[in-house]
Amino acid sequence: MQTPPVKDGPRINDEIRVPRVLLIDQHGEKQGEMPTASAMEAAEEAGLDLVEIVPNANPPVCKILDYGKFKFQEQKKKNEARKRQKVVELKEIKLRPNIDSHDYDVKAKAMHRFFEEGDKVKVTLRFRGREMAHPELGMKLLQKVKADFDEVAKVEYEPRMEGRQMIMILAPR
């Protein structure tokens, strides 16, 4: 024996089993509290559906409307909300301790663009060969980055050595 499928969404027409409801007509006007049967008749006369909008109110609030259209509008709202949602990405900018000023400016411009888009930026400073003997140069460069982006970004992960590279993560304010 199978159980009936669980219906999601509001109850409509015959699925509304409460004795009395608070009715709102198709024009959005409050009709007051009435027996469910009367509300069903009013919906039938209008050629529309009786939809339970607020089921946990006392009495439940029902509205006369076209259920197909209502479902479509709800789906549209959900899709719009999903579209507006921004996924924060982690972008990476790779630097070297002895970076030239113009190269630094180009990287800084890219970082500004990432912050405007609302993304986090991971600044990776890679050391090669003898550069490992001077981690203070790398720290100085990352402090410069931190100071340059103080107004638009906050430090989420302080500069730290990880193997042959120094890493810092900045997030937009």
Curated annotation (Swiss-Prot):
Here the disulfide bonds are: none
Instruction: Mention one GO biological process in which this protein takes part, according to its record.
Output: ribosome disassembly
Which cell locations does it reside in? Answer: Cytoplasm
GO MF: ribosome binding; translation initiation factor activity
Q: Which UniProt keywords apply?
A: Cytoplasm, Initiation factor, Protein biosynthesis
* PROSITE patterns with a match to the protein in the record: IF3 (PS00938)
The domain of life is Bacteria
Entry-linked Pfam families: IF3_C, IF3_N
Cellular component aspect of the GO annotation: cytosol; membrane
Question: What PANTHER family does the record tag this protein with?
Answer: TRANSLATION INITIATION FACTOR IF-3, TRANSLATION INITIATION FACTOR IF-3, MITOCHONDRIAL
| Function recorded in the entry | IF-3 binds to the 30S ribosomal subunit and shifts the equilibrium between 70S ribosomes and their 50S and 30S subunits in favor of the free subunits, thus enhancing the availability of 30S subunits on which protein synthesis initiation begins.
According to its UniProt record, which protein family does this protein belong to?
Belongs to the IF-3 family.
| Assembly and oligomerization | Monomer.
Q: What is this protein called?
A: Translation initiation factor IF-3
Organism equals Caulobacter vibrioides (strain NA1000 / CB15N) (Caulobacter crescentus)
The upper taxonomy is: Bacteria, Pseudomonadati, Pseudomonadota, Alphaproteobacteria, Caulobacterales
Q: Which gene encodes it?
A: infC
